Each structure stands twice: as structure tokens, then as C-alpha cells.
Amino acid sequence: MSAAPRDDRAAGPSGVLCPAEPWRLVGSLVVSFFRVPAGALPDAVGARIPAGARPVTVAGSTLVAAAFAHYAPGGVLQYDELLTAVPVRYGRRLAVTVPHIWVDSPQSRAGGRELWAIPKDLAVLTRSGRGAAVRAAAYADGAPIASLRAEVGARLPPGRWGAALTTLQRLGGQEVRARSRAAFRPHAARVSWSFAPSGPLGHLAGRRPWLSLALEDASVVFGTERTRRAVP
């Protein structure tokens, strides 16, 4: 597959070049969903949610997604990523806020922050595996953040799935709502996570996933539409 054409632009005060939106990315993801008591969510979650929005809770708990993504050649950028996301409600609408995210690409970091107010930080991410077995880990400043071991199982019917997603973010005096879409082949997965208890994802340490999936042959178009406003 040939790489998608790039439209580089300067992003942010660092002047790091990144593709203009929308970003077309291809690769695979391993994602798990955790039930977390609303009172156990760290302050960083609230700091990234725009005023007027709030996390979605059911029976006092919020569903937190944790994912490792591997974006491969064929998209506008190639990099690895660790993130968490929480569903939020604003008015009668639903969206997702990403409070924690790490990448190993300066271009991805710059673009995520400048274009969509996604608080990407740089980290060392490792990924290995053979066949259905996948291992991944993330480190920041030499300290572990999280790691996983996954066994990818059978493909789920009916084949290729599609999904639309809205992100709602607050960062650096900006609130940004962005729309994206994705297509992928979902697989069952057995995933074991390890989160550093004293790290930024310590609120997930010791918790078992409620559901885990492997998303193979994924195609993501991020930032198909965006609205932005300045906030105090």
C-alpha cells in the first residue's frame, strides 16, 4: 500500500511539521474497557473536559477505555500510541474525551495538541509479538506507565465494522470538538494489563477489563470536521 499524500504544516510554537487534517491512519489497536468508580477518576480527567460536559456514569461508575495503537505505513504518519478515553455528555449529545495519551512521534504530538487539543505527550513505546500474541509497553522519563499482553482470537461477525466518533477536548485555553470515522475488523482478545500504581494511570491499577477487543486492519480518518473556541 502506498503512503497517503502529506500536506505538511507547522503546528504549535515548536514549529514541528505535521500533516494537515484530516489524518488518514492505518494499523491495529488493542482496547480494553474498565469500570471505574466516578470518585476514583483523577483530576486530569476533569481538566480535559470542557465546561458544560461531564463523564457518563452508570450506577456510579464510568467506563474508561485504555488502548495501545500501532499506526503502520500507508497512512500520513507511522507511530505507536497509548491512550485512555472516557465517554462524556454535553447537552443531549455524547462524545469522548482523551485525558491521557502518549505517542513516540513528535509530529503526532504537535498535531494532536494544535489541531484537536488532545494532550499528547512523548514516551518510549515498545511493541512485539508473533502470530496472535501481542506485547506492548510505554515508558516516560524511564518510568513505566503501562504494559499489556494480548492473545488475539477469532474474528467477530459480520466482518468489517464502521464507527463514527466525536472527541471533545480542553487544552491551553482552547475547547475543540472534532469528528472522525473508522473502519476495522474486530477480534475477540484476552488482554492482561499492568499499570504503574503511582503513575498517571494508577486509577486503573489492579482493575480487570470488563471487555477487550483487538481491532485489526483498521483505517481511521481523524479530524473530518472541527469546531474550536477560546476559553478563559
Question: Which residue stretches match the model-derived regions?
Answer:
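N-terminal domain-onset segments
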Residues: 1-81, 91-96, 108, 208-210, ...
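Interaction-surface and assembly-scaffold signal
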Residues: 9, 113-232
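Aromatic- and glycine-enriched beta-alpha-beta binding-site module
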Residues: 67-144
